[in-house]
Amino acid sequence: MKRIGITALLILALAGVTIPSVQPATASGTHSITLMPNGTSGTSKIVRTTSHSYKLPKVTFTRAGYTFLGWAKSARGAKAYSDRATIRFTSSVKLYALWKEIMPAKPAVAGRTVGNLLWRDEFYGATGSSINADYWTGRYCDQADENGGGTCHNNEPQWYLPSAVALDGSKAGNAVITTKRVYAAPAEGRCLAWSGCQFTSARFDTQGKVAFKYGYIETRIKMPAGGRNWPAFWMLGENITSVGWPQTGEIDIAEQGGNTPNRNSGALHYSTNGVANDCCGNHTYDYGSYNGANYSADFHTYAMAWTPNRIDLIVDGIVFKTFTSTSIRSQYWSFNNPFFLIINNATGDFGGAWTYWTESQMTIDYVRVWKLDNQGEVFIR
C-alpha cells in the first residue's frame, strides 16, 4: 500500500473528507461460531474464523425421536438458518440446534376410529440407563397388592430385580429385560417359589403413577427365546389394593410361553361372585390365542382395543379375540375402571422346560395409548 504523506492527509481533512481507519487482522478480529446441541447429548462445536461469512457444517448432533430442522439464535427461538447455510456476522455468534418431535402414525383399526395420542413411552435414553421413573416402577418379588399388584405368584422360579431392565441406547429406543440362569442367589431380592429359584429377571409397572381407562393400547416387542421364559404385557385394575384379585380384573393383552414361540395368547380374569377380597375360589377367565410367526425371532405388535363393555385383543393388526360384558362367563364385568400397565418376563411352567440357555432378552420398543371411538383417558397420579 502506498503511504499518504502527512501534508496530503492534512489537505484532505481540511476539505472535509472522512478518512477511513485501516486495522490489520489480529486476534481481536477473530470471531467464534458456537453450535449448541440444545436438548440432546453431544458436545458443542466451536469454529473460529477471521471471515465475516461462514458456511455451516452438516449437523452431526442427533436426538432420538426428533428430526433436525435447522439453527436458531436462542435455545427456544425460531429457525434462523438451514443446515449448511452460509451465514454473515460481525461478531461472535451462538446457534442452537432446532428439533421437531417425530410423532408416530396412527394405527389402523378396522371399523374403529383412532383419535389423538394420549400417552407414550418410546424408551429413549443412554445405554444402560434406567426406565422412566415418572412412569414405571421396577419390582422385587413381593406378593402385596401395593407391589405392582403382587409379584412372583404361581411358584415362579425367578428373583425380580429392578436392575434387570435397562434402556439399550439405540436410535429406535428400547427397554430390555435380561433374564439369566443363575446358580447362586443375587445380593438383593427375594425368592418366593417353594421349589426354589434359578433365574433373575424383571417386572415393571405403572401402578400409582399412570392409569388408563379405555382407548387403543399398543406395544411392540421382540419376545425372549427359550423354554421356561414366560413374557407378558398386561394390566390390573387400579383398585386392586381395595377390592383385591380377581374382583379388580386382569387383562392379559399378550402372554407367551418360550416353548411355543409361535403361539400368542390373551385373557380376561375376573370374579364369579363380585365379592371383594375373596381370592381365589371365585376366579374364572376367558381366553383366546393366535398361532403366527416366531414371536421371539423379530418384533411384533400387540394391542388392545378397549371401549365400555368390550375388549378386542390384537396381534400384528389381527383381532384374535373379542370379549364383551355379555359374552364372558360371569355377570361381573370388572373392566370399566382405570387399570395400570405391567411388563414382565417371568419363568415357570407356562413357558415349558428350560432349554439350557444362559441368558434371554425381552426387548420392548414402545408403549402407546390412543383415543378410540372417542373413548380413552390417562390419569397421571
Where are these regions (language model features)?
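Generic alpha-helix initiation/capping and coil-helix boundary signal
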Residues: 1, 6-8, 90, 156-157, ...
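Secretory targeting and sorting signals
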Residues: 1-24
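GH16 jelly-roll
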Residues: 101-381
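Secondary-structure capping and domain/repeat boundary segments
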Residues: 25-102
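Short linear motifs in intrinsically disordered
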Residues: 22-27, 299-303
